[in-house]
Every structure is written in C-alpha cells, then in structure tokens.
Amino acid sequence: MSDTCGNCDCADKTQCVKKGSSYTADIIETEKSIMTVVMDAPAAENDGKCKCGPSCSCTNCTCGH
C-alpha cells in the first residue's frame, strides 16, 4: 500500500501523514524533574481514520463522512 495514506489515496504522497496514532508522547528528562508531554495532533476535519496533510486533496477519502 505504498500509494495510499491511511484509508485515502493522496495525489501527492509527500503530503500524507504517517498512519497511526495521532498522539505523540515526548519524555523530557532534566536534572531536577521528569516531564511527560502528551500532545493531541488531530488531522483536519476527520475522526482519525484518515490522516492527510493540509495540502493533500484526497478525492476518495472516507474520513468519517
């Protein structure tokens, strides 16, 4: 499935966001404290089933529609 991005076909593959969880966990260690930062990075206007970059027009993407 090298020509698909999640559940959608993208004309420009470089605009596709890697399929997987939209949550990123970064663990930052310092001398005095340990901090865990969890960021929610939702893809635009979908329910997480399809992730495409903002410049990617996925014509047959079913992003929860």
From Swiss-Prot:
A GO BP term here is: intracellular copper ion homeostasis
Q: Which GO terms describe its molecular function?
A: copper ion binding; zinc ion binding
> Its domain of life?
Eukaryota
Q: Which UniProt keyword terms apply here?
A: Metal-binding, Metal-thiolate cluster
Q: What does this protein do?
A: Metallothioneins have a high content of cysteine residues that bind various heavy metals.
Instruction: Tell me its family.
Output: Belongs to the metallothionein superfamily. Type 15 family.
Q: Which PANTHER family match?
A: METALLOTHIONEIN-LIKE PROTEIN 3 (PTHR33357:SF3)
Name it: Metallothionein-like protein type 3
Q: Which organism is it from?
A: Carica papaya (Papaya)
Which taxonomic lineage is given here? Eukaryota, Viridiplantae, Streptophyta, Embryophyta, Tracheophyta
